[in-house]
Amino acid sequence: MAKPATIKIRLNSTADTGFFYVTKKNPRTMTEKMVQRKYDPVAKKHVEFKEGKIK
């Protein structure tokens, strides 16, 4: 069996609310850490989410 091309990552909120999203990325094409601006329902506004490892 071949190794999967995508890995699961965790996008942690920079608002320090503890909220996170789980998404996938291809580490061969996206070598840098992923940063996205998404909605944080705990903070009730859009904030940046930065990539972290799934424990």
Curated annotation (Swiss-Prot):
Among SUPFAM superfamilies, the record links this protein to: Zn-binding ribosomal proteins
Could you state a single Gene Ontology molecular function term? Answer: structural constituent of ribosome
Species in which this protein is naturally found: Hyphomonas neptunium (strain ATCC 15444)
Highest taxon of source: Bacteria
Q: What is this protein called?
A: Large ribosomal subunit protein bL33
Q: Which UniProt keywords apply?
A: Ribonucleoprotein, Ribosomal protein
Output a single Gene Ontology CC term carried by this record.
cytosolic large ribosomal subunit
The gene from which this protein is expressed is: rpmG
> What protein family does this chain belong to?
Belongs to the bacterial ribosomal protein bL33 family.
Q: Which GO terms describe its biological process?
A: translation
Concerning InterPro entries, the annotation shows: Ribosomal_bL33, Ribosomal_bL33_CS, Ribosomal_bL33_sf, Ribosomal_zn-bd
Which Gene3D superfamilies does the record match to this protein? Ribosomal protein L33 (2.20.28.120)
